[in-house]
Amino acid sequence: MSRNIGVIGLGAMGFGVAQSLLRAGFNVHACDLRPEVLQRFADAGGVPCASPAELGSRCDVVLTLVVNAQQTEAVLFGANGAAAAMQPGKLVIASATVPPGFAEALGRRLAEQGLLMLDAPVSGGAARAASGEMTMMTSGPAEAYSLAEDVLAAIAGKVYRLGAAHGAGSKVKIINQLLAGVHIAAAAEAMALGLREGVDPDALYDVITHSAGNSWMFENRVPHILKGDYTPLSAVDIFVKDLGMVLDTARHSKFPLPLSAAAHQMFMMASTAGHGGEDDSAVIKIFPGIELPGKAE
């Protein structure tokens, strides 16, 4: 008999995870604040829920794919939260990007209610989520992995087991976000210089993606700039948050991160200028004196 799996948050990553779970044959329940997204989920064969509590009462495993620690707190422990409705021995897979200390405390709080947890941030983007090929950075007790094994196999191409202590997965995720944010900022700076110097941007993209200066983020994000399409898959404000979290972690350890600080300021400038809800590649819009490619009509 197929297990009941819950997904809280049907954003770019969450909807793809739900699709992968449906494809694997699970009974998938989900909740989201947007009725149109829940309808699309229902049309795909899923079971919409009115609240996290309703979802938690139905499911053996609950995945939280929300934006941050505050949303994780709300969907698990707020009004109509999932945790109080779940049966002891069930599992929460917490996949938001959160401070490591929050992940540690979350594991303790869930354990007090008799629930297991995996600290399990994700990476790879919406396309990999939809194809079941995400990367997951996980940590937690062996019993949690036993309950999660078939779920993880359905949604991830690579699952890293980083120890039994909650927080280890989140530490690795924020280091990944350090690199991701710096690489996006560097890609924007490089393209901005090219535009300022009159280099054809399409030619520049082709050269860099076949040269040593390339990065995954350059190759993935610069096409958004070339098309003039800043429809958000991951927004500027995500990196305001995530690089802020990186810097807070380093500050706690009294550890300098000069590149991260510079990149964070770039995303802050873009957000302050009104681009916070746009795709993170819109960080290029902070540079003066350049004409960006326009979106084709």
Curated annotation (Swiss-Prot):
Keywords: Carbohydrate metabolism, NAD, NADP, Oxidoreductase. InterPro entries: 6-PGluconate_DH-like_C_sf, 6PGD_dom2, 6PGDH_NADP-bd, HIBADH-like_NADP-bd, HIBADH-related, LtnD, NAD(P)-bd_dom_sf. It catalyses: L-threonate + NAD(+) = 2-dehydro-L-erythronate + NADH + H(+). The active site is at K173. Its EC number is 1.1.1.411. GO terms for molecular function: NAD binding; NADP binding; oxidoreductase activity, acting on the CH-OH group of donors, NAD or NADP as acceptor. One of its GO terms (biological process) is organic acid catabolic process. NAD(+) binds at residues 3-31, 97, 241. Disruption phenotype: Deletion mutant is unable to use L-threonate as a carbon source. SUPFAM superfamilies: 6-phosphogluconate dehydrogenase C-terminal domain-like (SSF48179), NAD(P)-binding Rossmann-fold domains (SSF51735). Pfam families: NAD_binding_11, NAD_binding_2. Catalyzes oxidation of L-threonate to 2-oxo-tetronate. Can use either NAD(+) or NADP(+) as cosubstrate, with a preference for NAD(+). Belongs to the HIBADH-related family. L-threonate dehydrogenase subfamily. This is L-threonate dehydrogenase. It comes from Cupriavidus necator (strain ATCC 17699 / DSM 428 / KCTC 22496 / NCIMB 10442 / H16 / Stanier 337) (Ralstonia eutropha).
